[in-house]
Design a protein with these regions (language model features):
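Positively charged n-region of N-terminal signal peptides that target proteins for export
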Residues: 1-5
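Cyclophilin-like peptidyl-prolyl cis-trans isomerases
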Residues: 6-184
Length: 184
């Protein structure tokens, strides 16, 4: 019983995603990526993940993500898919990996005719999608480890600037055979 309560407390502490602020910021360090947009993910426990988004690399993706943030779409959602050393995934209002927003956007990556210079390395945020190249809507993932084999196949659009320790904590929660945290 104590173990179940502890696991539930840890997951409640880590897994609830609430995006609470979004604002323009100074240009990115890499002049190639243009002005950046800062987004902050605030966890239920107060943990913070700060993201720098790059509209020059993926303008449609960044605009969609920021619009969803501003609408409160992500408020209260969980990271529903967690694979240590690969990624943590959120943005599904159903919490199953099958849901999303009503809007589907163009996949901004090489296989879909878009020059996106961002590589899927530790800390990069990218859009999740189905097999269809233009199926991304609201689900996203943050790379927990390098996944450069995804380059050219998924729309990377920013990176974690602060809070990788929070990503590491989420990536360490117990999961079931479908990579879903065992407790919401």
């Amino acid at each position: 019983m104590k173990k179940k309560i502890l696991i539930a407390a840890v997951l409640a502490f880590l897994a609830v995603l609430t995006l609470v602020s979004c604002s323009k910021d100074k240009p990115a360090e890499s002049g190639d990526l243009g002005d950046s947009v800062m987004v902050q993910i605030e966890m239920q426990n107060g943990g913070i993940i700060k993201l720098e988004l790059y509209p020059k690399a993926a303008p449609i993706t960044v605009e969609n993500f920021v619009n969803l943030v501003n609408e409160g779409f992500y408020d209260g959602l969980i990271f529903h898919r967690v694979i240590k050393d690969f990624m943590i995934q959120g943005g599904d209002p159903e919490g199953t990996g099958m849901g999303g927003s009503d809007t589907k956007i163009k996949g901004e990556f090489k296989q879909n005719g878009w020059d996106n210079p961002i590589s899927h390395v530790r800390g990069v945020i990218s859009m999740a999608r189905s097999r269809s190249m233009d199926s991304a809507s609201s689900q996203f993932f943050i790379c927990h480890g390098d996944a450069t084999y995804l380059d050219g196949q998924y729309a990377a659009f920013g990176k974690v600037t602060e809070g990788m320790d929070v990503v590491d904590e989420i990536a360490s929660v117990p999961t079931d055979k479908n990579d879903r945290p065992v407790e919401d």
